[in-house]
Amino acid sequence: WVIGQQQQKRIASAQNSSVGIGSTAPEILLKNPDGEAIALSSFKGKYVLLDFWAGWCAPCRRENPNLVKAYNKYNDKGFEIYQVSLDKSRDEWLRAIKTDNLTWTQVSDLKFWGSPIAKLYYIKSIPANFLIDPYGKIVAQNLRGQALDAKLNEIFK
């Protein structure tokens, strides 16, 4: 049993290393609410928060005001948000974007937990996020609230 547990940890570690700190963020190409495909790589040259969320996810919705604050504070300094929704209902997704005043890039394949992008990034729960540097490297993971502001303040001071 202990050996099995160690093996599972090794497998999880190997999987997560492809999206761990220092790794190049895998490309994402998903459609925004207008049906336009937007690539994550189109934001190269800026710091990007890749954020996984959903309209039905209460903890995600509670975190959105922190993202709005960070976006408003750092966007003109070179900070963007690329938010990937794991919604399955287009209406619920669009309603949440409007209600939470989310003005940055929103994309989804509306495939819920079956989204290939969620699998690519080993997303097991949301909210989940990755801070990506201007060169496409992951520099931090799961920064929320004050931790996100502190990291961005350090970067953009």
Question: Where are the regions a protein language model picked out?
Answer:
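N-proximal helix/coil linker or "cap" segments that precede and/or mark the start of modular domains
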Residues: W1-K31, S41, K46, N72, ...
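Short, internal strand/loop/helix patches
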Residues: P26, K31, L94-Y135
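Generic structural signal for well-ordered beta-strand positions
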Residues: I38-A39, V139
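Conserved redox-active cysteine motifs that mediate thiol-disulfide chemistry
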Residues: K44-G45, F52-K69
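Alpha/beta-hydrolase fold active-site loops
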Residues: Y47-V48, P127
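Short beta-strand segments
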Residues: D51, Y82-S85, V107
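Structural microenvironment flanking redox-active thiols in thiol-disulfide oxidoreductases
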Residues: R62-D100, F112-K119
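Thiol-/selenol-based redox modules, centered on thioredoxin-like
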Residues: D133-K157
